[in-house]
Amino acid sequence: ALVFLLAGVGLGLATAMGWLSGFVRLAHLHVLLAGWICITIMGAMTQFVPVWSAVSLHSRRLATAQLWLVAGGLAAFVAALLTLNFALLAAAGSVMLVGFWLFVYNIFRTLPPLTEFDITEAHFALALGFFLLATGLGLLLAIDFTTGMLFEWGFNRLAVVGSHATLAVFGAVMTTVVGALYQLATMFTQTDLHRSDPLLQRFESVVYPAGVAALAAGRLLENPVLARLGGLAVVAGVLAVGFIVARKLLETQVDWTPMLSRYAVVTVMIGAWGALTARAWLVDPLAADSLLAAPGAVHLLAFGVVGFVVLGTLYHIVPFIIWVHRYSDLLGYEPVPMIDDLYSDRLAAVDFGCLLGGLLGGLLGVFAGVYFDGPTLLLAAGGALVILGALLFTANMLLVVRRHSPHTLVGILGVPGDHERGEDDPSPAVDQE
């Protein structure tokens, strides 16, 4: 996932500078969303659904296979987009589809019975359904490049693209994000639910999934009324979640952490995205330039909301997994570090500043270009800060693995063989920063 993050940032720069040919923007979007975001979601669900639900993972072999199928398929898919090799595009898309569907099957078999679902598990189950629909439409779009079958079936290709993007971003990704935030925001602020919170959660649990389905169907069928109703429901559901998380952050009972700092950015970006996008979707929910947000505001959602949720969550997930495997058995027998001691606070602070500055600079640059035909200096500066922040974040996570994991990086990736650290490997001691 970290490799795809860096590749996505690089492709974003190449898109802005015009360095590559082919479908560069499409490759950029798929590397970040299908690569960095979705592979992170796959790993997080595989690791934490068994913990949250107090069950055993259905199959670790499937978990390893799905990673390589999605990662390998996506690498070939991106190469096909850049070289305009449409035959390879369909083949690579098929490999990705198998990987995603293995993931859906594995997690669905891991989840408890439907009657025992809590709100997080219910959102995860819905997200799995959206994964099936989004990837299925995605493969049809890849095949359509060489067959033109969508036209023969009476569908507008751009309408199918809009439905696919809606199911992928608002269905698969955002439904997962919402479900995780309900669990994580409560857990890591050590706060209780207000009397209004269950009402907001029930409102969102009905309105948001129905809105995603209506927006996707409205775009597929080119029905503006259905799409408009669905879009407004999506905005209302996301704003409800943002309100709950913002209140928990204000009432937090714990010291501020990199995770909470990034979640704070998320709540602000949700408000800004909702205000701009509601108006755009009221006017025209089928417009190509307002597919995920108002014109010029797509990064509010993609980076400001989804990206910062993933970044903040990884600041807990990666150290937590390493801590469990390396130190949990030593607890009570010898001094062990806290989870937040495993990463560098200094790097975390600097990467946060770079990424936030890059986001704000990029947004101002995009808005200047869209609405005022302004210069691209802000956009270039923002992009440079994002690249630096992504590199620092990746370095911080890799240092956690290098210094503290009982396994080598090769072993963590699931390559067969003995990849335990030997006695000559660096000791995973506590950082002294």
List each language-model region with its residue ranges.
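Hydrophobic alpha-helical transmembrane segments of multi-pass integral membrane proteins
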Residues: 1-433
